[in-house]
């Protein structure tokens, strides 16, 4: 692995670990599982390959999705009627809901979800 590729892989790994810390800081079992999964994937792809750059980009994209789009919810254990409390941190992407404001217009789907 070239020096620049190794540095990029380390940077992506650190970004992924930081993102798991931000998103799962109140949920230790999930935090540990997410970090183990990241470690296993990086160890599995330790040797340089043709798609190493793609794998590094994938790790960076996963870190960004975790950091900007994943919100954890929790409620008191044993109380199924309790309200959910969401852990919305500063880096969560917030939408403006413009599509909801349009109202009463037919939504056209141009292709199937699986394609």
UniProtKB/Swiss-Prot annotation:
Residues 1-23 form a transit peptide. GO terms for biological process: mitochondrial respiratory chain complex III assembly. InterPro entries: Complex1_LYR_LYRM7, MZM1/LYRM7. It is found in: Mitochondrion matrix. It comes from the Eukaryota. One of its GO terms (cellular component) is mitochondrial matrix. GO terms for molecular function: protein folding chaperone. Keywords: Chaperone, Mitochondrion, Transit peptide. Coiled coil: none annotated. Interacts with RIP1. Assembly factor required for Rieske Fe-S protein RIP1 incorporation into the cytochrome b-c1 (CIII) complex. Functions as a chaperone, binding to this subunit within the mitochondrial matrix and stabilizing it prior to its translocation and insertion into the late CIII dimeric intermediate within the mitochondrial inner membrane. Modulates the mitochondrial matrix zinc pool. Belongs to the complex I LYR family. MZM1 subfamily. This is Mitochondrial zinc maintenance protein 1, mitochondrial.
């Amino acid at each position: 692995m070239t020096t620049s590729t190794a540095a990029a892989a380390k940077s992506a790994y650190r970004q992924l670990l930081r993102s798991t810390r931000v998103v799962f800081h109140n949920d230790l079992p999930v935090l540990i599982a997410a970090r183990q999964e990241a470690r296993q994937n990086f160890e599995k792809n330790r040797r340089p390959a043709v798609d190493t750059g793609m794998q590094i980009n994938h790790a960076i994209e996963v870190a960004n999705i975790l950091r900007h789009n994943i919100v954890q919810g929790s409620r008191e254990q044993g109380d199924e009627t309790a309200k959910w409390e969401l852990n919305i941190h500063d880096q969560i992407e917030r939408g403006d809901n413009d599509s909801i404001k349009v109202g009463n217009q037919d939504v056209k789907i141009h292709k199937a979800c699986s394609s």
